[in-house]
Curated annotation (Swiss-Prot):
This is Small ribosomal subunit protein eS10B. Belongs to the eukaryotic ribosomal protein eS10 family. Keywords: Cytoplasm, Ribonucleoprotein, Ribosomal protein. The keyword Cytoplasm applies. It is found in: Cytoplasm. Pfam families: S10_plectin. GO terms for molecular function: RNA binding; structural constituent of ribosome. Residues 88-160 are annotated as: Disordered. It comes from the Eukaryota. It comes from Drosophila melanogaster (Fruit fly).
Amino acid sequence: MFMPKAHRVAIYEYLFKEGVIVAKKDFHAQKHPELESIPNLHVIKAMQSLHSRGLVKEQFAWRHYYWYLTNEGIEELRSYLHLPPEIVPSTLKRPARSETVRPRPAVGGPRGPGDASKTGEDRSAYRRAPGGSGVDKKGDVGPGAGEVEFRGGFGRGSRN
């Protein structure tokens, strides 16, 4: 497809600067959202050309194209745009880590300081005592020891 060289160079510069470019699958859009002076069709066709040469990887989801530069694409665009090797796409740059100090949680256990009022005594009230309930669990074990109770579980309502 014929397109002005200025459009192609602007698309390649943006792609090299960002490392990725996104375009909606709308061939009739008057302009691309990031590149206001360039039609969306020119962006799609330029990226399809790079994809056919193996310089970008293409993903398509939800009516949007996503193109990512490959290592070969970085070298090719660097030579096409006459850029020095020190300049790299922003996807390859490591984010600057700020040395911010995170507040440490207060010592009070894994649940935080709000649960410090709950002690083992509060929790022990919910636990069963080893012999305090009056039920002999060991004596009820065996065939025929338990009572069989039939209750209706299926059907249309309860019949008494």
